[in-house]
Amino acid sequence: MVAVAAAAASRATAESEPEWNVAAPDLLYAEGTAAYARGDWPGVVLNMERALRSRAALRALRLRCRTRCATELPWAPDLDLGPASSLNHDPGAAALHDLRFFGALLRRAACLRRCLGPPSAHLLSEELDLEFNKRSPYNYLQVAYFKINKLEKAVAAAHTFFVGNPEHMEMRQNLDYYQTMSGVKEEDFKDLEAKPHMHEFRLGVRLYSEEKPLEAVPHLEAALQEYFVADEECRALCEGPYDYDGYNYLDYSADLFQAITDHYVQVLSCKQNCVTELASHPSREKPFEDFLPSHYNYLQFAYYNIGNYTQAIECAKTYLLFFPNDEVMSQNLAYYTAVLGEEEASSISPRENAQEYRHRSLLEKELLFFAYDIFGIPFVDPDSWTPEEVIPKRLQEKQKSERETAVRISQEIGNLMKEIETLVEEKTKESLDVSRLTREGGPLLYEGINLTMNSKVLNGSQRVVMDGVISDDECQELQRLTNAAATSGDGYRGQTSPHTPNEKFYGVTVLKALKLGQEGKVPLQSAHMYYNVTEKVRRVMESYFRLDTPLYFSYSHLVCRTAIEESQAERKDSSHPVHVDNCILNAESLVCIKEPPAYTFRDYSAILYLNGDFDGGNFYFTELDAKTVTAEVQPQCGRAVGFSSGTENPHGVKAVTRGQRCAIALWFTLDPRHSERDRVQADDLVKMLFSPEEVDLPQEQPLPDQQGSPKPGEESLSDRESQPKDEL
């Protein structure tokens, strides 16, 4: 932690202005808004830029001073006073102890006063601080920059404001307009207020979700390093004046030790809240859950996927510091240990900075819970990993009673709402069913394809199972293509699954298969068949769901999963856990957050099975709780499952416990802007390699009983949803 504190101090020194030449940001902001009102655009730029720099410089000054004074004047123990118990019998020694304690405190305060100087008087009001946090200066700046023809800066300011205010429709329109202007480049759309730790984390998670563990690792490691620096900065900035919460100072009355307690507990609570602050991003409604531990979760699996078992064990052990009873992580650790060897694995310890962080955090929580229990000063623990023994027994019982009361009231309200909903549903169900039936059940287009299960049979909406999409010979040829591509060195390289260490997978994308075919490493006709089959599935799904807008490929790959024989004993995990394809599923809260790193633009999904000669691997739909199974589908050659990608269709894949499961997984979007670039390249390559008659798919053959209105009993699909994992 010493190195981290030094890094925080050096960053603050670099960011701060020399000496005390820092203007008041509130005055500069006021001058900027006044300039905006009179149309003085250079004045807006001058004052708003200075206001932003001034606020940043004040923050850096406070951070530098508090870090430096804490380093130069630490709280040193009184080594020459003997054991603390002896102070009870020696009033003189106790008084001396107090004097030394307060002497250190006074010296720290004097250090801060000298360091901070006159700028310490610049305190923003709560309202103005909120304006800066909302990034309001950038709203003014983007207009002013545009007016004085500084387009690059206008774009950056607009983007910075929009990141913090994603619901601001006018700014969205401005950004759309900027995108159409000549001279505007993609790199101009940058967030000037981006936090390094969050930027690296989101980039690392995106690469991880795209199954690029080698590229993800450096960003996730950088995110961790930046996190600890940001944490030290946040904690140092908590040591400000006491917040009386409105007009409470008028009635505040406390003796010396109560006043010290109140202020210190407030500071500790602020420091604990850094967990929430650092896990927050302006574009998200809620902070990332278990933000710091999640870094180690991503890293342990990323390291595992690139074959670095030493680091995988270190990160797994670090994660288990926070969640020691996590069964999946314990299972992963046991697997890594078996591969690396018990002796070498036992010498690997959790990361030291994480151990220090956890130890310090638990000590702070103990004090805060003690203050909650004795003085009634509320403390809301931001972490889910806090051990129960840290909380005093009496407080545990009180919280348990409060939770039970809240649950009872919630259940009563819920029951009442269900009664009302049932009445409403009964009134609307009939009309809804008719509406769904009129949408789902379009022609299947090709002879031989049969409708096996519709939404009604699958107990949901916007779901379908079809058989006969391809023949047995085509299934076998595509399976051979996957294995041939794997041995030729494709993008997957025969790695273990990104979702479970108990399976290996081999896969190839359409473009990669065509390129391998062009190079003679796999049969070119097989690669062409793969291309045609994916287009066939796209057309069928588009027709069956009666979509008014064309479906575009978002991502597609042919993948085979093989059970690792020695890893199947007492296996409890899934081949792919329950998820949603275009949002991040929080099963406990029954919500799905549609924001990055989820692939929010995905609208429909499909999976075409190539075989069924394996154990396990069944596909299943669930409710939002990820536990209540609503339908299950057993794979077989030529069987396709299609569904909308939204919250109405959470799904997962059961563990493959024997053999190899092969399938083509496809995701589609209704937005052409998110059409897969690889697909466009694949289209061009097919046109170059094959004659026009070879490129065309077999003639679509509408079947008489599949045209017109759907048959009674057929239902439709409605919404869409998804998750940041390219697996079905």
Curated annotation (Swiss-Prot):
Record-listed Fe cation binding positions: H579, D581, H651
Catalytic activity, as annotated: L-prolyl-[collagen] + 2-oxoglutarate + O2 = trans-3-hydroxy-L-prolyl-[collagen] + succinate + CO2
InterPro entries in the cross-refs: Leprecan_dom, Oxoglu/Fe-dep_dioxygenase_dom, P3H, Pro_4_hyd_alph, Pro_4_hyd_alph_FE2OG_OXY, TPR-like_helical_dom_sf
Chain coiled-coil ranges: 393-431
E.C. designation(s): 1.14.11.7
Tissue expression remark: Expressed in basement membranes of cardiac muscle, skeletal muscle, central nervous system, intestinal tract, trachea, ear, skin, liver and kidney. In kidney, localizes to the glomerular basement membrane, mesangial matrix and Bowman's capsule of the nephron. In the renal parenchyma, expressed in the basement membranes of tubules and blood vessels. In the ear and trachea, localizes to the perimeter of resident chondrocytes in lacunae.
GO molecular function, one term: procollagen-proline 3-dioxygenase activity
Region of interest: Disordered: 691-728
GO biological process: bone development; collagen fibril organization; collagen metabolic process; negative regulation of cell growth; negative regulation of post-translational protein modification; positive regulation of neuron projection development; protein folding; protein stabilization
Protein name per UniProt: Prolyl 3-hydroxylase 1
Catalytic site: R661
Job description of the protein: Basement membrane-associated chondroitin sulfate proteoglycan (CSPG). Has prolyl 3-hydroxylase activity catalyzing the post-translational formation of 3-hydroxyproline in -Xaa-Pro-Gly- sequences in collagens, especially types IV and V. May be involved in the secretory pathway of cells. Has growth suppressive activity in fibroblasts.
Entry comment on modification after translation: O-glycosylated; chondroitin sulfate.
Signal peptide (residue range): 1-14
Family assignment from sequence similarity: Belongs to the leprecan family.
Iron found in the keyword field: yes
Compositional bias (Basic and acidic residues): 712-728
Subcellular location: Endoplasmic reticulum; Secreted, Extracellular space, Extracellular matrix
